[in-house]
């Protein structure tokens, strides 16, 4: 393989902490990286780098399978998923596997199958990773030119990008196929408290789908996170899958335009930084989605959202006091506003008390009680169903709060109850991971730009300000 540039120019020399440890073709002298820099030693060894990536995929899939089986082994069907600290089974249940009306788990066998399939896949990936890391060719360019590459080869890089986009598009269409033809998905909005159904009347209108992208991200609007029906979600996946596949074909067939060649840095570390930036954005979006959205992440499996738990508490006490004879339409609270019901600034009838800040919550157990002007007093008096009372009481005591005391007027459990909502876990973990991926993006982007500009060795030490300062001692 012809290396198009010197290693020294693009890869800074790191300090070797252990000079005696040397592996043929993997030591500091031949790669410019010390042993602790991991896969950086394999930057120009496409075969070995393939092994590292396949092995990494094996670890990821092994975790998924093992954790899946762990959750199945610990699962208690009588308790809601969100009380059991589960993060994988809720995803499988949302896809419509093993659940029936109201989100009740009727069969755990599909979950077991999922775990076993992932374990078997991880074994295949693990074997492939070890093979390519230890036995396979060091570089792929000579033997398998289709899979070989040089980082500076812009045409090859966009071809690889295109292949990735096509795979992502196929992934989006797998959800579409599940929703349309293979048993459907769980719809929390199905009448009577949620059910699995096939999605038939897809939303394909570009004005609706792309309207989400044009919405404000702030309260009441909520950008794409505000999606609240499965027709839009599955229709969006058709659009997204189509765009990804067409974009992938485009990137395979074309070469980068001159402006793109000039605008981007074309090196392995630059591509790493772009990928980290993309993953960071995904992490932040996922954080907001799992925290606020109860359609893509049904509350039956993930527990209520924060606003939902707060509104559920107001609803629960409205039901109780109405039964005890309170006139919920006119009772005054301690602030002079309505105790149970009040009007929002725009005139809708909303729940009173601290939960007024969450007045724009939409939830399947509450929407049937709304009329054209917000909550309908006559429906609140005559139409409340037992399942709505049960669900709101359950949600009231399972707020996604990690606090020791009450927050936002929501009753939290007594200290003897060890409850952390999966929404809290998933939102927090994705925010933190998104943040660190963003820091990694800044770090690798800075190094890649410096290497491309030819000054990755750092600033000239002769002119450092500290040299002209008085020593500390």
Swiss-Prot record:
The modification Phosphothreonine is found at residue 15. It is a multi-pass membrane protein. Binds multiple chlorophylls and provides some of the ligands for the Ca-4Mn-5O cluster of the oxygen-evolving complex. It may also provide a ligand for a Cl- that is required for oxygen evolution. PSII binds additional chlorophylls, carotenoids and specific lipids. This is Photosystem II CP43 reaction center protein. Gene3D superfamilies: photosystem ii from thermosynechococcus elongatus. [CaMn4O5] cluster binds at residue 367. The chain crosses the membrane at residues 69-93, 134-155, 178-200, 255-275, 291-312, 447-471. PSII is composed of 1 copy each of membrane proteins PsbA, PsbB, PsbC, PsbD, PsbE, PsbF, PsbH, PsbI, PsbJ, PsbK, PsbL, PsbM, PsbT, PsbX, PsbY, PsbZ, Psb30/Ycf12, at least 3 peripheral proteins of the oxygen-evolving complex and a large number of cofactors. It forms dimeric complexes. GO terms for biological process: photosynthetic electron transport in photosystem II. Residues 1-14 form a propeptide. One of its GO terms (molecular function) is chlorophyll binding. Keywords: Acetylation, Chlorophyll, Chloroplast, Chromophore, Manganese, Membrane, Metal-binding, Phosphoprotein, Photosynthesis, Photosystem II, Plastid, Thylakoid, Transmembrane, Transmembrane helix. Pfam families: PSII. InterPro entries: PS_antenna-like, PS_II_antenna-like_sf, PSII_PsbC, PSII_PsbC_sf.
């Amino acid at each position: 393989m012809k290396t198009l540039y010197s290693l020294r120019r693009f890869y800074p020399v790191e300090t070797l902490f252990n000079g005696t440890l040397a592996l043929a073709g993997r030591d500091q002298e031949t790669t410019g990286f010390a042993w602790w820099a991991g896969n950086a030693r394999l930057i120009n060894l496409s075969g070995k780098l393939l092994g590292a990536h396949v092995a990494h995929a094996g670890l990821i899939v092994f975790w998924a399978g093992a954790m899946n089986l762990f959750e199945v082994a610990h699962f208690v069907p009588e308790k809601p998923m969100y009380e059991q600290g589960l993060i994988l089974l809720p995803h499988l249940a949302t896809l419509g596997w093993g659940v029936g009306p109201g989100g009740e788990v009727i069969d755990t066998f599909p979950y077991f199958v999922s775990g076993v399939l992932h374990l078997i896949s991880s074994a295949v990936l693990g074997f492939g990773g070890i093979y390519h890391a230890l036995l396979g060719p060091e570089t792929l360019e000579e033997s398998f030119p289709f899979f070989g590459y040089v980082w500076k080869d812009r045409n090859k890089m966009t071809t690889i990008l295109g292949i990735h986009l096509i795979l992502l598009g196929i992934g989006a269409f797998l959800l579409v196929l599940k929703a349309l033809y293979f048993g459907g998905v769980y719809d929390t909005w199905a009448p009577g408290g949620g059910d699995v159904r096939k999605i038939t009347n897809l939303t394909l209108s570009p004005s609706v789908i792309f309207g989400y992208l044009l919405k404000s991200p702030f309260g009441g609007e909520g950008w794409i996170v505000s999606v609240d029906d499965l027709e839009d979600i599955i229709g969006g996946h058709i659009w997204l899958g189509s765009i990804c596949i067409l974009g992938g074909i485009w990137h395979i067939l074309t070469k980068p335009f001159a402006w793109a060649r000039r605008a981007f840095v074309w090196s392995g570390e630059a591509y790493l930084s772009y990928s980290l930036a993309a993953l960071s954005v995904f992490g932040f979006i996922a954080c907001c989605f799992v925290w606020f959205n109860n359609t893509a992440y049904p509350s039956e499996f993930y527990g209520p959202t924060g606003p939902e738990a707060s509104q559920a508490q107001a609803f629960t006490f409205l039901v109780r006091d109405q039964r005890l004879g309170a006139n919920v339409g006119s009772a005054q609270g301690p602030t002079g506003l309505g105790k149970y019901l009040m009007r929002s600034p725009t005139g809708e009838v909303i729940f009173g008390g601290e939960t007024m800040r969450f007045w724009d919550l939409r939830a399947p157990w509450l929407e049937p009680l709304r009329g054209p002007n917000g909550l309908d007093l006559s429906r609140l008096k005559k139409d409340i169903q037992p399942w709505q009372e049960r669900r709101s009481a359950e949600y009231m005591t399972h707020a996604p709060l990690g606090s020791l005391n009450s927050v936002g007027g929501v009753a939290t459990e007594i200290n003897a109850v060890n409850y952390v909502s999966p929404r809290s876990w998933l939102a927090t973990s994705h925010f933190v991971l998104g943040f660190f991926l963003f820091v990694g993006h800044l770090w690798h982007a800075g190094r890649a730009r410096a290497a491309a500009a030819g000054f990755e060795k750092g600033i000239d030490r002769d002119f450092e300000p500290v040299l002209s300062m008085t020593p500390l001692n």
